[in-house]
A protein has these predicted regions:
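A short acidic, often aromatic-flanked loop/helix-cap motif at beta-alpha or helix-coil junctions
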Residues: 104-110, 126-128, 174-175
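Structured adenosyl-cofactor binding patch, chiefly the S-adenosyl-L-methionine
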Residues: 153-194
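Glycine- and other small-residue-rich loops at beta-strand/loop junctions that grip anionic moieties
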Residues: 40-41, 148, 173, 177
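Short, solvent-exposed amphipathic alpha-helical segments in soluble enzyme
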Residues: 54-58, 134-137, 158-161, 185
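Active-site/ligand-binding-proximal alpha/beta "capping" segment
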Residues: 118-157, 164-169
């Protein structure tokens, strides 16, 4: 999980606490992936576990729990999430394990990430298309998913002031947070990274 590739090696010798080997060939090159972050309002444990597992399998490189006005679950067990991320990385044969940040307020997230490319799950927009031209190649992509009950009006206004923001409606139905996250990451991966 060092992001440098995968190698095959021949063991030359084994002694107490030491294994000497010779690399014979490279099996996989370093992953050359665009960074995809998932900023999300924490949700109930079972649903959060599913969201983290599937988002890891889909290629998310960083998870950022966001505390909003309407966040119900305010404590996140980072150790539990790290275990899920490792298991999902192994299952999906990833070379790099995603990072998980400590929970941060939406206000601080916006302040720290003014130039970030943010694709915002927005129930109030008519936009159902991603435009590659609005995405800066210099910065990571961040999928931003709101809490149960959505962002407050004030929070939505703050989000929409971000420099590289794309509000996106993915469905006419109101989706659960974990469904919205998985759907948005799939859409981003397919449309912008292919």
């Amino acid at each position: 999980f060092n992001h440098r590739g995968e190698w095959e090696a021949k063991i030359n010798s084994i002694s107490k606490g030491v294994v000497e080997f010779c690399v014979t060939k490279q099996l996989r090159q370093k992953e050359n992936l665009k960074e995809i972050w998932l900023a999300f309002s924490p949700i109930k444990l079972n649903y959060l576990n599913i969201m983290i597992q599937k988002a890891t399998e889909l290629g998310v490189t960083k998870f950022i729990p966001i505390i909003t006005d309407r966040t119900i679950v305010r404590k996140v067990n980072l150790n539990r999430l790290e275990k899920i991320v490792v298991e999902s990385s192994e299952q999906s044969n990833r070379l790099k394990i995603p990072t998980i940040e400590k929970a941060i307020s939406l206000e601080n997230f916006i302040e720290k990430n003014k130039d970030l490319n943010v694709i915002f799950g927005d129930l109030n927009t008519d936009n159902m298309n991603l435009n590659k031209n609005k995405i800066s190649d210099k910065n990571p992509l961040c999928v931003l998913i709101g809490p149960e009950g959505d962002f407050s009006v004030k929070e939505r206004e703050s989000i929409l002031k971000l420099k590289n923001i794309i509000p996106l409606k993915i469905n006419d139905n109101i989706l659960r947070s974990e469904t919205a996250a998985i759907s948005m990451i799939s859409i981003v991966s397919f449309n912008l990274l292919s």
